[in-house]
Amino acid sequence: KPNDVWIGDGHSFKAKVAHPVHGRPFKPEVTVIIDGCTRFVVGFSVSLAESCVAVSDALRIGVKHYGLPIIYYSDNGGGQTGKTIDHEITGITSRLGIRHETGIAGNPQGRGIIERWWKDNLIEMARQYETFTGSGMDSSTKNLMYRKMESAFNALEKGKDLTEEQQKYLKKLP
């Protein structure tokens, strides 16, 4: 029934965006937790990299707005299974009384509900950006985009004026 089982996972966003500190292109980590029954997103976090902090933040949002699930189901990634999450005394799930179950390593089909969510939502969103880097993108186009953006950032760091082409590629970076 609703709110019994939450399913969590993290993925890098499949498009490059401007890093919030230095502005260079990077792919942020998006952590999402959905309700297994309703497929409703109960928590999320956007971070610089996969981490227990990102997972904890997504759990915090879910618990704050929807209460406690009985089971939290995730993969075996470092962000999902670190001591911050799983330690039997100090871990978030044990302190909140949530049973944390993990899938079989290398078997994403076991988390098909959330894997489908990624495909239908986040990957489709990333495809809307010219900086998309996911599967199906032509590798020569991806390499050209990367080289042109690197050229622009290198020129900026050296205090050089940007060419029209460098300016054009910088504008593509969300």
Residue ranges and their predicted role:
Residues 10-12, 34-38, 46-50, 76-78, ...:
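Short, flexible loop/turn elements at secondary-structure junctions
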Residues 1-32, 40, 53-58, 65:
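Mobile-element integrase/transposase regions
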Residues 78, 82, 86-174:
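Globin-like tetrapyrrole-binding proteins
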Residues 6-7, 73, 101-102:
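A structural signal for short, well-ordered beta-strand segments and their strand-loop junctions
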Residues 20, 46, 82-85:
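Short, solvent-exposed loop/turn segments at secondary-structure boundaries
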Residues 27, 51-88, 92:
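Acyl-donor binding region in acyl/amide transferases
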Residues 36-42, 67, 72:
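Coil-to-beta-strand transition motifs
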Residues 48-55, 114, 118:
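Phosphate/oxyanion-binding active-site loops and adjacent basic polyanion-contact surfaces
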